[in-house]
Amino acid sequence: MTKRPVLIKEAILVNQAFETIDECLEQSGKLLVDNGDIEPEYILSMKEKVEQHPYTTYLPGAGVAIPHGMSEGFKYINHTGISVLQIPNGVDWLGEKVFIVIAIAANSDEHMNVLASLGDSLESEEDAKNLWKTNSVDKIYDILS
């Protein structure tokens, strides 16, 4: 995989509204497809992860979901990348209200590095809430970069 930015501004959408997890996965996956990070099949892998290992796809109490694919889906990743959906009114994610969806496309070698980096970016509840409240792609980009 060639080295390129993991997050680009074109992969961030603010002021979104979704009714279901599935809609979130479709849109976040579409952003990754449009940027060449994944093949469409990886979206199915993200859906499988939510179904089979649901509690590995969000941060309880933080209002943040971090969907990613199963290891079998790694073959559909072209480049490590993330997409971000900001949902001001939230969406129900396994009984929790989620306001930010950060979809990850990373192979096993890079997956933990991406998660650690996101963890650093969302270290405080205040940082997470800033993501929920801003209307600025630039601000979300700055917080997560």
Can you say where each PLM-predicted feature lies in the sequence?
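Cytosolic covalent-transfer regions centered on His/Cys nucleophiles
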Residues: 1-145
